[in-house]
């Protein structure tokens, strides 16, 4: 079954557009495996978007998980291989939660139909499905796979990853769980959590990955508030975020492609060598920060306004705080330490033409949507009555940007990136996995070998071997003996009868005559 309405169409529109742009961005890549994985991944996202039942959704959901991991593995480094395995493990677990929820829901309702779920009718099945969706939406503490795997993906693979998995999760949450208040609270916390890590991170693509958690927080919060304006805001932000976040990943990827470096502490002073990439990266930075006349301005504030209209003052405060962190980490820190800052001595060439064309199209979309928001608003699931370009919204945005800029200048030395590792929730499952393996090898394995193994040997293995020996004797002596005896008897009599067949007519005549006399004798006497 399929589901085609304004909600699915707006996501399908941006997924298709971004797939085309990233394919253009990756034209220089001579790796058929990577391209195949990317196309399957994009196709899976569209399959989920148009799924009208949970069976179809689950099939394409798993297609996304198993195809996207190859975009990490194809970088072919030890870190990317390990990150890919962790990524796959987490998504397989999430898929099992989703599958369990789907099966349980079918048992409860007798239907696989995919549609809205009422907060009052929350059941075990709904809870399991929600966990599966939230994992793909990178809801803390289930978010570590994103900041772990995305920075280790290939240059072009990271751009694909930034566009699909998490935004598909936003779509299914908006479709099924709009109005769940717990999501509004979780989303606001996500928004702040992500920018905190983005502000202290050193790796450029990991900054963007952490900040993606923050932006997803806005979307999840909008879905949780559940009003028409809030859902419109979540969808609009998902659409624009795919555009400008993709542009930022393209810019950071181009720098990695041309310099071989992604850590801010290893970069700096390259603005004169890659001016076009610099322009495109700054465009993405100001757009994601919500500058007027950019895509971020006409989408992000819609969710904040929706929170204010529903009198969620604390949520609104957290979202505004996250906006400050966004401009600080991605709008200022990221471009400054990549392009300016101290001179790293690197003299890279400009990125290939196809990369520039893809970034140019995406940058154009950032400005086009900001200048002409009606293009996006007409695609949103509900009528839009909110106007971004009011004196209040403009003054609010400019004050936020101005004072954040002043703060960046004041605390510039404190924000200078250092080559260090930041501990996140992935530490627990990394350490937990090691502890589990140690427990399994040192305790469980010994118990299994010394105790369970002996029980298995005495109760199962030896009796089975004894029965097998008896069956073997029966098979060879009785079954095979009977069959072989019949065969041997036939061969013996065949040999005797063969002696009679001499080929001479007089012998046959004598035998026939003797036979005749024997028959007559038997009849008469």
Question: Which residue stretches match the model-derived regions?
Answer:
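Hydrophobic alpha-helical transmembrane segments
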Residues: 2-15, 125-133, 316-324, 391-408
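Hydrophobic core of alpha-helical transmembrane segments in multi-pass integral membrane proteins
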Residues: 16-23, 99-102, 192, 362-367, ...
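Hydrophobic transmembrane alpha-helices and their helix-loop junctions in integral membrane proteins
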Residues: 21-32, 36-57, 67-354, 371
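Hard-cation-handling environments
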Residues: 351-404
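Aromatic-capped, Gly/Pro-kinked transmembrane alpha-helices
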Residues: 378-393, 415-525
